[in-house]
Amino acid sequence: MKFEAVVRTELGKGASRRLRHAGKFPAVVYGGEEAAVAIVLNHDDIVNQMDKPEFYEGIVLVIDGKEVKVKPQDVQRHAFKPKVEHMDFIRI
């Protein structure tokens, strides 16, 4: 599975809320030798694939044209809506 991601330029609560209202959500990629990277993902693209076991075995994120193989580490969901608030990915 391959997903497009964009590096976040605005950080903080207000910027995250604006992303969620626009149908996206914040995430972070960390691990390995490289520094952690804050990214933005399209909500519907990710949520539609989360029910498949392959999603949790490893996916490819295309971050500014560079392919990074990652595995979902943590998912923060909304309390009562079927929405993802934030995700953590670890490089593999």
UniProtKB/Swiss-Prot annotation:
One of its GO terms (cellular component) is cytosolic large ribosomal subunit. SUPFAM superfamilies: Ribosomal protein L25-like. GO terms for biological process: translation. GO terms for molecular function: 5S rRNA binding; structural constituent of ribosome. The keyword Ribonucleoprotein applies. It comes from the Bacteria. InterPro entries: Rbsml_bL25/Gln-tRNA_synth_N (IPR020056), Ribosomal_bL25/Gln-tRNA_synth (IPR011035), Ribosomal_bL25_short (IPR020055), Ribosomal_L25_dom (IPR029751), Ribosomal_uL5_bac-type (IPR020930). Pfam families: Ribosomal_L25p. Belongs to the bacterial ribosomal protein bL25 family. Part of the 50S ribosomal subunit; part of the 5S rRNA/L5/L18/L25 subcomplex. Contacts the 5S rRNA. Binds to the 5S rRNA independently of L5 and L18. NCBIfam families: PRK05943.1 (NF004612). This is one of the proteins that binds to the 5S RNA in the ribosome where it forms part of the central protuberance. This is Large ribosomal subunit protein bL25. The gene is rplY.
